[in-house]
């Protein structure tokens, strides 16, 4: 049986691991290192360099060297080299191909199967892009696994049978995740996860670069940001300085011949950076890790004191300020020192590959979806079908209905996020279900099913229960999330919770009022068109019609309290209408049956009180 590898496809560095005799082994690359820089360069002679060789020539080949491409996964980003455009998936595939070659050289056999990790907070488009990168690299991607989950799997499997709660704090080169997991008796279950897809070691490096640029400009008057080669040298020096400050109180940044002055005289950069200053200029970055931590503890429904172990993942967790913050957040709990933060994710991925291949027995991995999923319904409301932190794989269905009479089709718009208003979330994709037979609004029943597979990739189906017609979409389009979108998604939901609540309440009230107006109007019309004349007194019908007119006027405005008031009045008058027809029927016949009150309709027990917006979003 072909071997399967576990791959940690990182922003700055990547690692590949494989099971040997049931134990995971990290594979050294052809340069002899256990980590491979996620850097790709296109040499001018046509050669494609990957890893350390690409990183080594970056200064002299700035425009043709790509780093940190993981931050562009799931977006429409591309780079043009020699007239050809390369997507983020293609660049990532180059890194995966090198890892694949190195693993094949180590094992002496071909590798086709792999488990690849992604940040827990990656959205659907980003996960799909990662899978595509694997396919481009010639790999059969068995599973996409969340990085903190893989780390917990590597850490927790040999910790005995007692159930334990583990916090994984994962700060890598470009992404940040925090997850709470329970491990016991071979089961690894994710309780909650949160994070920031645009926070990582690169951001700390950038602060040092900016600090050096400002210092140099202050002494020489020259702005180094206009010199690409100088900036590449600064980036490399900043990374080294950051690493040195993890073990020393100060570091020197000495870059001779960094640029020349107006007289073509060479200039040197020589600065001393102390740890305290480094921590001062990066404090706000560190503070951005607090909210996801607090969110995870809250979502998991536990107290900090219930956390048994803290596992640090990612090279950026070596910074003393990060370690100190984690200790502060966990009430003084010392992080576990028994795992290599650079390698533990790949080790966990290899173990999961072993589980899928049957090499590792009696292990069950239960992961979660990091963000809620739903569709847009009438009023622009986000109707969630799957809540965040739901264990995957999972499948949920809800039945919706049409917004207009004789509506021939419905537009299903799929969103991911936590906001109450759909447009404030991430649009993953949309599709149309056509061929709905003519019928009054509220009669057709459209069943929408969300299916998330074990990779966290979403499939959505819409089916007309009446005709059996259905349409399915595998969410794979989408532009990915911008820097602002992803880290604001949950934070905005909390910051704007009150605003969202009011808008949702307004949408709900409008929907209820419109439905009542429609049903009452229809009932009055039927009474007036009765063959033998209506048994309801004319003044009662006129009174109800006046109430309908008032409700319509209120719906034309923006005063939600006026709509509520008009709806209450119409409801009372409608009840009087029902009472009048009941009394008239009783008087006419002793054997009388029950007549439908306004609003009566066929049983819709399974129908959610929301309506799918057709095509264009209705203006509010």
From Swiss-Prot:
CDD domains: ASKHA_NBD_HSP70_DnaK-like. Signal peptide: none annotated. One of its GO terms (molecular function) is ATP binding. Pfam families: HSP70 (PF00012). The keyword Repressor does not apply. InterPro entries: ATPase_NBD, Chaperone_DnaK, Heat_shock_70_CS, HSP70_C_sf, HSP70_peptide-bd_sf, Hsp_70_fam. Keywords: ATP-binding, Chaperone, Nucleotide-binding, Phosphoprotein, Stress response. Induction: By stress conditions e.g. heat shock. Residues 606-620 have a biased composition (Acidic residues). SUPFAM superfamilies: Actin-like ATPase domain (SSF53067), Heat shock protein 70kD (HSP70), C-terminal subdomain (SSF100934), Heat shock protein 70kD (HSP70), peptide-binding domain (SSF100920). The modification Phosphothreonine is found at residue 175. Residues 588-620 are annotated as: Disordered. Acts as a chaperone. PANTHER family: HEAT SHOCK PROTEIN 70KDA (PTHR19375). Belongs to the heat shock protein 70 family. This is Chaperone protein DnaK. It comes from Mycobacterium leprae (strain TN). The lineage of its organism: Bacteria, Bacillati, Actinomycetota, Actinomycetes, Mycobacteriales. The gene is dnaK.
């Amino acid at each position: 049986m072909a071997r399967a590898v576990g791959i940690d496809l990182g922003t700055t560095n990547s690692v590949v691991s494989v099971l040997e005799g049931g134990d995971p082994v990290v594979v050294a690359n052809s340069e002899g290192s256990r980590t491979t820089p996620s850097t790709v360069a296109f040499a001018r002679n046509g050669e494609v360099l990957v890893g350390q060789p690409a990183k080594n020539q970056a200064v002299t080949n700035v425009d043709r060297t790509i780093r940190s491409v993981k931050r562009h996964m799931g977006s429409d980003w591309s780079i043009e080299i020699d007239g050809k455009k390369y997507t983020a998936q293609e660049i990532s595939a180059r890194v995966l191909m090198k890892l694949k070659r190195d693993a094949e050289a180590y094992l002496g056999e071909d590798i086709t199967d792999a488990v690849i990790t992604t940040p827990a907070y990656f959205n659907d488009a980003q996960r799909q892009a990662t899978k595509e990168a694997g396919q481009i690299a010639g790999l059969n991607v068995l599973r996409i696994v969340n990085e903190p989950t893989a780390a917990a799997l590597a850490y927790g499997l040999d910790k005995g049978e007692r159930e334990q709660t583990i916090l994984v704090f994962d700060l890598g080169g470009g992404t940040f995740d925090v997850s709470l997991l329970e491990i016991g008796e071979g089961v690894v279950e994710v309780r909650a996860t949160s994070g920031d897809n645009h926070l990582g070691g690169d951001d700390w490096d950038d602060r040092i670069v900016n600090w050096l640029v400002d210092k140099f400009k202050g002494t020489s008057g020259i702005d180094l940001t206009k010199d690409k080669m100088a900036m590449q040298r600064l980036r490399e020096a900043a990374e080294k300085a950051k690493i040195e400050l993890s073990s020393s109180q100060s570091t020197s940044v000495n870059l001779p011949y960094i640029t020349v002055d107006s007289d073509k005289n060479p200039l040197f950069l020589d600065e001393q950076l102390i740890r305290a200053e480094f921590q001062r200029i990066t404090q706000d970055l560190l503070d951005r890790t607090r909210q996801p931590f607090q969110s995870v503890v809250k979502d998991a429904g536990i107290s900090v004191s219930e956390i048994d172990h803290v596992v640090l993942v990612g090279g950026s967790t070596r910074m003393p300020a990060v370690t100190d913050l984690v200790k502060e957040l966990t009430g003084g709990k010392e992080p576990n020192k028994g795992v290599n933060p650079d390698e533990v994710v790949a080790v966990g991925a290899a173990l999961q590959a072993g589980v899928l291949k049957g090499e590792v027995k009696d292990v069950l991995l239960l992961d979660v979806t990091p963000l809620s999923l739903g569709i847009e319904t009438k009023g622009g409301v986000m109707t969630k079908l799957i809540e965040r932190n739901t264990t995957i794989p999972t499948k949920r269905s809800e039945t919706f209905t049409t917004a207009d009479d004789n509506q021939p089709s419905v537009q299903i718009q799929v969103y991911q996020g936590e906001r109450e208003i759909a447009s404030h979330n991430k649009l993953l994709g949309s599709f149309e279900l056509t061929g709905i037979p003519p019928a009054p609004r509220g009669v057709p029943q459209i069943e929408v099913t969300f299916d998330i597979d074990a990779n966290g990739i979403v499939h959505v189906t819409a089916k007309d229960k009446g005709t059996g017609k259905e349409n399915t979409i595998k969410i794979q389009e989408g532009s990915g999330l911008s820097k602002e979108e992803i880290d604001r998604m949950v934070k905005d939901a909390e910051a704007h919770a009150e605003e969202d609540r009011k808008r949702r309440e307004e949408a709900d009230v409008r929907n209820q009022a419109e439905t009542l107006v429609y049903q009452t109007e229809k009932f009055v019309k039927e009474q007036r068109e009765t063959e033998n004349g209506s048994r309801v007194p004319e003044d009662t019908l006129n009174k109800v019609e006046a109430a309908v007119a008032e409700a319509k006027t209120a719906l034309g405005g923006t005063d939600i309290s006026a709509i509520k008031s008009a709806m209450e009045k119409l409801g009372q008058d409608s009840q009087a209408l029902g009472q009048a027809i009941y009394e008239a029927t009783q008087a006419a016949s002793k054997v009388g049956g029950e007549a439908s009150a306004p609003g009566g309709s066929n049983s819709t027990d399974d129908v959610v009180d929301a309506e799918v917006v057709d095509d264009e979003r209705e203006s509010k």
